[in-house]
Amino acid sequence: MQAPYFPIIYVRGYAMTEGERDQTASDPFCGFNVGSTVYRAAVDKNAPPKRFIFESPVLRLGSDFGYSDVYEHGTDIMDADWQPRSGNAGIAARSVVVYRYYDAGSTLFGDGKASPIETYARGLDTLILRVRDLVCKQEGAEADPPGGAVTPENFRCYLVAHSMGGLISRYYIQNLMPVTGGLRAAHQLVILGTPNAGSPCANIFSIPMAAELRTDV
């Protein structure tokens, strides 16, 4: 495994309602497969839209950099019956992994209730350790060339997080990664639209998850 070809783990943003969590649980990539045909920001707000086609992060990572997803026969790597692709021992370093933390909070696969950020961060820790183990199996001591072997000590991944997903990732890095065997597993964190200083809108909603984003506490 050579940088920058580390596994990419996508952590999606906030889904407030039960219906939104169900919709998220129904999407294999939780929005990471959504593209665009226009620039969504411009210096001049009155300027006409500019056409620019971006296929989606998932498609671009596959077509330009050789990444692939880890779903096999309708299962995810966190499912008990997941099996690697034929001829493989685990997953490649160039893998796109989606952290499906809202599955348990949907009515489709769980109790329909959201959980605290700390709970989601612990789940992210578990997922990263699972990815580490599978990459080590695929590109470990028997890797070709041997010098490219991946071990638990040198394993790294990228975290790409949107909105509240950035808060989950930060909690993992700051509180869990150093003490749960993750070492320096997160090589880089990319956050998109994360309310690092809280969100004024959180004061509008009287739900536990919104309280974690308030700016006055």
Regions found by a protein language model. Give the residues of each.
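Helical cap/lid subdomain of alpha/beta-hydrolase-fold lipid enzymes
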Residues: 5, 10, 16-57, 62-63, ...
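Cap/lid segment of the alpha/beta-hydrolase catalytic domain
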Residues: 98-115
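Structural recognition of the beta-strand scaffold that forms the well-ordered cores
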Residues: 7-11, 95-100, 158-159, 188-191
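Alpha/beta-hydrolase fold nucleophile elbow
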Residues: 141-162
